[in-house]
A protein has these predicted regions:
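N-terminal Rossmann-like NAD(P) cofactor-binding module of classical short-chain dehydrogenase/reductase
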Residues: 76
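Nucleotide-sugar donor-binding catalytic core of glycosyltransferases
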Residues: 1-48, 52, 56-66, 70, ...
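A charged, aromatic-enriched C-terminal amphipathic alpha-helix characteristic of glycosyltransferases
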Residues: 29, 308-341
Length: 361
């Protein structure tokens, strides 16, 4: 079967994109995969709204042209927030493609720019919607979803299975007691500011975009910023050279999880994450395969405890690594495909299911 994978693909090999990690697992399932980068920018500057509108029109027309040429049995979209409902309908009508979307943000988060009107209006057009939070399923059904599957932020096992070599230079460059890898946000800065002020003896390393733009040189955080966003093997080196990797959950993720929930355990390193139901109970078990915090005081206590108890850290690292192996992209996509085939039959990919929800755990 032919599958058109629509996502953000970077031409810069140093920049990791999640969509790229879907290619090999889908090929292993027997799909002939063709990719389409929906974030191609045809203007040097995107400052003008007219440029944005024209660019979106070009992208939508190019996607339709690519689909008409390739005639995919399945079009698998990863976010694809700029793809218009009319484009989806045209592809369904002219190519008879089965449309799937995995949305890695909240599809209803218009308030912070993580979703668009295209997505909200397009929810009912997709044949199958994949979502990382059980809490969002009722809203998706109300929005007209035909079929919904719970699909966690599975990690790329091919990337995380690769051996990394830590040189002395790497150790000097990445070494820290506590590490955070992620984009600047006010709430994240507040948490890290508390750590700096209450635990000044710790070595804190921050990697991510927008930190230098938002943290003034007078802030206690400024000298903790090591650099911009890091990905792939570079990120794994930062994890390996730190005793504790912190994870903060955005408000839009509610009681769910995020990419770091699995990436850190998959790296065989220690994760200390903001407590959510999914992380502490559903995906891992708090105190055995994951460590969590909810308040500044609890965060300080957990940092001090685990910094001084390497054996306790190692137990959780081993348990979390084993548990994370259930959440590789290869396994989760295979479960999804098997569930679909068992439900509908291998030759019935175009038939539609009305308002049903399937769950992958």
């Amino acid at each position: 079967m032919k599958l058109l994978l629509v996502g953000y693909f970077s031409q810069d090999p140093s920049i990791y994109t999640y969509a790229t990690s879907f290619i090999h697992p889908l090929q292993k399932l027997g799909f002939e995969v063709k990719t389409f980068n929906y974030r191609t920018n045809f203007f040097l500057s995107g400052k003008f709204r007219l440029h944005t509108i024209i660019n979106q029109c070009i992208i939508n027309q190019q996607l339709l042209n690519a689909a008409l040429k390739f005639k995919p049995d399945v079009m698998f979209c990863i976010k694809a927030e700029t793809i218009q409902p009319k484009t989806l309908l045209a592809i369904k009508k002219q190519c008879s493609s089965y449309l799937v979307n995995f949305y890695p943000d909240s599809p209803f988060a218009l308030w912070n720019g993580n979703s668009t009107v295209n997505i909200v209006k397009g929810i009912a057009v997709y044949d199958h919607f994949l979502i990382w939070s059980h809490e969002l399923i009722p809203a998706l059904i109300s929005a007209g979803c035909k079929q919904i599957s719970y699909f966690p932020f599975a990690f790329d096992n091919e990337l995380f299975a690769q051996n990394i070599i830590i040189t002395e230079k790497d150790q000097r460059y990445f070494s820290s007691d506590v590490c955070f890898v992620g984009t600047w946000e006010p709430e994240r800065a507040q948490w890290l500011d508390i750590i700096c002020k209450k635990l000044p003896f710790l070595t804190l390393a921050i990697w991510g975009n927008e930190w230098f733009n938002n943290v003034p040189p007078t802030s206690v955080l400024y000298n903790k910023i090591r650099g911009n966003a890091i990905y792939g093997m570079t990120m794994r080196k930062a994890f390996a050279c730190s005793k504790i990797i912190l994870n903060f959950i955005r408000r839009q993720n509610i009681q769910a999880h995020n990419m770091r929930t699995f990436e850190v355990p998959a790296s065989k390193t220690f994760l200390l994450t903001q407590r959510t139901y999914d992380q502490a109970t559903l995906l891992f078990k708090e105190g055995e395969s994951i460590a969590c915090f909810a308040t500044p005081d609890e965060l300080m206590q957990k940092i001090i405890f685990y910094i001084n108890n390497e054996q306790e850290r190692d137990i959780i690292v081993q348990n979390s690594f084993l548990r994370a192996q259930e959440f590789t992209l290869e396994k989760q996509l295979s479960k999804l495909y098997t569930s679909f085939v068992n439900q509908k039959g291998p030759h019935d990919i175009h038939s539609k299911t009305q308002n049903s929800a399937s769950f992958i755990t």
